[in-house]
Amino acid sequence: GLGDVYKRQSENSTSIGVRNADADLACEVLNEEFAKEIEMGEISPILAERDLATVAIVGENMKHTPGIAGKLFGTLGRNGINVIACAQGASETNISFVVDAKSLRKSLNVIHDSFFLSEYQVLNLFICGIGTVGGSLVEQIRCQQQKLMMENGLKLHVVGIIDAAKAMFSRDGFDLSNFREELKQKGKDSNLQTIREEIVGMNIFNSVFVDCTASADIASLYKDLLQHNVSVVAANKIAASSAYENYRELKTIARQRGVKYLFETNVGAGLPIINTINDLIHSGDKILKIEAVLSGTLNYIFNKISADIPFSRTIKMAQEERYSEPDPRIDLSGKDVIRKLVILAREAGYRIEQEDVEKNLFVPNDFFEGSLDDFWKKVPSLDADFEARRQVLEKENKHWRFVAKLENGKASVGLQEVGANHPFYGLEGSNNIILLTTERYKEYPMMIQGYGAGAGVTAAGVFADIMSIANV
């Protein structure tokens, strides 16, 4: 039987929809009927494209309602569904289109969600990394799920949970009150290929990959996921601070595919720093200068150092309080601050690599060599010098701050002495602070300050990025 007929506007091709079982016969009879035209080169031989599906949306209210077709095809495109052919009835009460049969289920879900035939808007989440930040995020989602459904019509559906050893995926989602035990019992071995194949293979609409790891391997998945119309929310700062060309490519792919690549928590945990810079830039402002204290660990260390607590002890305290990395040399090297400054500079419109950042470190280079045990043995040798310098600092009523700075396109990080009249002077605990000098905020820079470390606030920042994808 003959289904739909699709004719191109240019009038140089016509497509006919038939059942898969009738495809060979249809080609045979048409090639016989048009044998003379084919022989003369007037038309090409008739060929069959198999494993396709026709979807039709029908509704009386479609008549004289502008934008229905645009909304339909825009929604399909944002979810990576390719429309092979389409037709609209002259009565304006139906639109039919052809897609790959593998995309049929996804197409139906997308249409139902977009045209409010579904009770809720759904976001399908793949959460990678369930340590301190990822675990806190899952708990925050669990606590908010019911409220978001009732008050915002948004259903957060966790369809994938991944850690370093195990991974589990299900279209039906998971019980977040018992996810660790379920992962332990039902999870498959976790590796990059499995993660990629499962997410892409599920081909599920409104998908978001949430990276709460610090893994370069996981960050290498972003490009492929974005190309398959999966949005990416990253607490992981490796990709955004990698080679500039890679950073730009990820943002370009996301824009072209109509999905999001968000990484607000790369700098300042839950503080709205990157979004603020983006808002300033998009509204026509220009970032002239950035000054910031971006390491909660280093700020904690320099706030704790005193006559009673030597430098080496403050490092140990930061490790015990889980402010620092397990290997605190990562924090002391300034690498983390350099990455954060590079990300801010790029978001502010500057093309900067990590190697371009000038470093003025306060620990000799040889302390970063050898084992961690060697470091702990050597670091007390720095205590006397730091105490002598601290006493001078105390007499001058100054504090140490490890400052990241961008000015005139040049970036630097280093230990600075700040006086009582400086905005950084009273910065407490592990807090972060950033000053933005712009064309509009030139005399009095914009200041953002608050908790810059901690699983709860970082997870909340990741959650906020997820919510922005839902436009709630």
Regions found by a protein language model. Name each.
Residues 56, 289-294, 299-302, 317, ...:
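Catalytic, metal-anchored helix/loop core of enzyme active sites in primary metabolism
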Residues 28-55, 122-125:
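Long, charged amphipathic helices and adjacent flexible linkers at domain junctions
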Residues 2-6:
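Short, small-residue-biased leader/transition segments that mark boundaries at the very start
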Residues 22-39, 102-118:
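Charge-rich, low-aromatic oligomerization/scaffolding segments with amphipathic character
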Residues 255-258, 262-321, 331, 335, ...:
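Rossmann-like NAD(P)H-binding beta-loop-alpha module
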Residues 216-227, 237-263:
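Rossmann-fold NAD(P)-binding glycine/threonine-rich loop
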